[in-house]
UniProtKB/Swiss-Prot annotation:
This is Deoxyguanosinetriphosphate triphosphohydrolase. SUPFAM superfamilies: HD-domain/PDEase-like (SSF109604). Its EC number is 3.1.5.1. One of its GO terms (biological process) is dGTP catabolic process. Residues 66-273 form the HD domain. It comes from Klebsiella pneumoniae (strain 342). Its cofactor is Mg(2+). PANTHER family: DEOXYGUANOSINETRIPHOSPHATE TRIPHOSPHOHYDROLASE, DEOXYNUCLEOSIDE TRIPHOSPHATE TRIPHOSPHOHYDROLASE. NCBIfam families: dGTP_triPase, PRK04926.1.
Length: 504
């Protein structure tokens, strides 16, 4: 078992322009303060204010956006981190674990990972993800590339079809097709901070947002030892080299996770479960009283002194008593949130410490709040009621379907860029406008400069005479379109779709 020493994990160095040396705790803290500034001031964080949490295109400012949700996750993450450090201090383990001079960076890395955890999410959340993946699957048919070359391969792109006698190229084609059909918000977050935004964060800070460890091109069965850690794609083929370097810098074995990521994940789980229910009441999907009844019915066996009675019933009774002379609804959620935090945060901290050897190594194959405990049952209660009563509500489903159509429609609109030959697209990139390509020229002009530069840099690194050049150029071209559309806010995507479809 590896010795637990967080000085080997909280790596303050950066990919570029790393400080040559640090001598004091203050020097290290200053480096992580720089990370905080880069993150808080980034456009990706600002865009979260117009991205969906649960209710797309919501005009009621009291209902959460991705930004307000992320701020709440940040606070809960800070709370859990402080609880962990406090308990380790009580057990006189801070020095032994190399944390005595790293308590500030420990908290900061968790907080900023919490703030950033959703930056890669596309417009309309999971329905935006589904739209991107479905659109590319219909055109690239990754399932047809899993075996030997097929005469009836449904892939529409000639460069990506498998060919007899091209074993190495076929392996790459297989990876590319799978990768492009596995868009995921967490993987896009890694791409944003490194490739697109060039934030040059510390290795520890980036490691903390690598939530899932499965490569997006993975098409085999996941190993049982990492079934949870690899349940979703965590990074793309485009960032393979960067993530390999990240693992080396953080001393992580393949498919293992950075230790502090478990805290970020627990903070997200705690935050959104209560918040989604509160937003549903704010939207008048049901009343606070109806919500309490839903929770009561779904809990099942009610015993005196149960966690349900300590958290939910206690909040309900206090809100009825109206000690603070405020609206009973507001009081109910205040008490529900406080009671939930006061139970789940210490439990998450205890689970973190109890499983620290596996968590430090990075192969603890569970979430902190997913076990057979009452705390896990309470969290599952909130999730199940939200799924049954909120996400299945006709108003929510209608907006989600509209979001799916908007993203699919935008991909249709920008498809001419993907249908251009390598020669024509290269000419368009070089000249920015080509008279014989009027539609493609106008579409290309609309793409973000940041995304175009990322494409150009990636293609310039390729060897033009190499057999895989055409294949990888097309891969980065698809990434360009995915980067642009996934980076839109909900409102921008909605307005852009309406404008380009000539609805207004």
């Amino acid at each position: 078992m590896a010795k637990i020493d967080f000085r080997n994990k909280i790596n303050w160095r950066r990919r570029f322009r790393s400080p040559p040396r640090v001598e004091t705790e203050r020097d290290i803290l200053r480096i992580f303060e720089s990370d905080r500034g880069r993150i808080v001031n980034s456009p990706a964080i600002r865009r979260l204010q117009q991205k969906t949490q649960v209710f797309p295109l919501e005009r009621n400012a009291a209902v959460r956006t991705r930004l307000t949700h992320s701020l709440e996750v940040q606070q809960v993450g800070r709370y859990i981190a402080k609880e962990v450090l406090s308990r380790l201090k009580e057990q006189k383990l801070l020095e032994e674990y190399g944390l005595e001079e790293l308590t500030g960076p420990f908290e900061s890395v968790v907080e900023m990972a919490c703030l950033m955890h959703d930056i890669g999410n596309p417009p309309f959340g999971h329905f935006g993800e589904a739209a991107i993946n479905d659109w590319f699957r219909q055109r690239l048919a990754p399932g047809d590339a899993l075996g030997q070359p097929l005469t009836d391969d449904r892939c529409e792109v000639q460069a990506l079809r498998l060919h007899e006698g091209e074993t190495a190229l076929n392996a790459l084609r297989r990876k590319v097709r799978q990768d492009l059909c596995s868009f995921e918000g967490n993987a896009q977050g890694i791409r944003l901070v490194h490739t697109l935004m060039r934030m040059n964060l510390t290795w520890a800070q980036v490691g903390c947002i690598l939530k899932y460890t499965r490569p997006a091109w993975w098409f085999e069965a996941t190993p049982a030892s990492h079934s949870y850690l690899m349940k979703k794609p965590g990074y793309y083929l485009a960032e393979e080299e960067y993530v390999a370097r990240l693992r080396k810098e953080l001393d992580l074995a393949p498919y293992n996770r950075f230790p502090l990521t478990w805290i970020m994940e627990a903070a997200d789980d705690i935050s959104y479960c209560v918040a989604d229910l509160e937003d549903a009441v704010e939207k008048r999907i049901f009343s606070a009283e109806q919500l309490y009844q839903h929770l009561y019915d779904a809990w099942g066996n009610h015993e005196k002194g149960s966690l349900f009675s300590q958290v939910v019933e206690n909040a309900w009774e206090k809100s009825r008593a109206n000690y603070l002379r405020q609206s009973a609804e507001d009081q109910f959620f205040m008490y529900l949130r406080v009671n939930t935090l006061n139970k789940l945060v210490p439990y998450a901290a205890r689970r973190f410490i109890d499983n620290l050897p596996a968590i430090f190594t990075g192969d603890f194959n569970h979430a902190l709040l997913e076990d057979d405990s009452d705390c896990s049952q309470l969290l599952e209660l909130y999730k199940n009621v939200a799924m049954k009563q909120v996400f299945s509500h006709p108003d929510v489903e209608q907006l989600e379907l509209q979001g799916y159509r908007v993203i699919s429609g935008l991909l249709d609109i920008y498809q001419p860029l993907l249908k251009l030959s390598l020669e024509d697209f290269s000419e368009l990139v070089a000249q920015e406008r080509v008279r014989r390509l009027p539609i493609a020229s106008r579409l290309y002009q609309k793409l973000s400069t940041r995304h175009r530069l990322a494409y150009v840099e990636a293609v310039n690194k390729l060897v033009r005479t190499a057999p895989e050049f055409a294949l990888m150029e097309y891969y980065y071209r698809c990434r360009l379109i995915q980067d642009y559309i996934s980076g839109m806010t909900d409102l921008y995507a909605w307005d852009e779709y309406r404008r380009l479809m000539a609805v207004e």
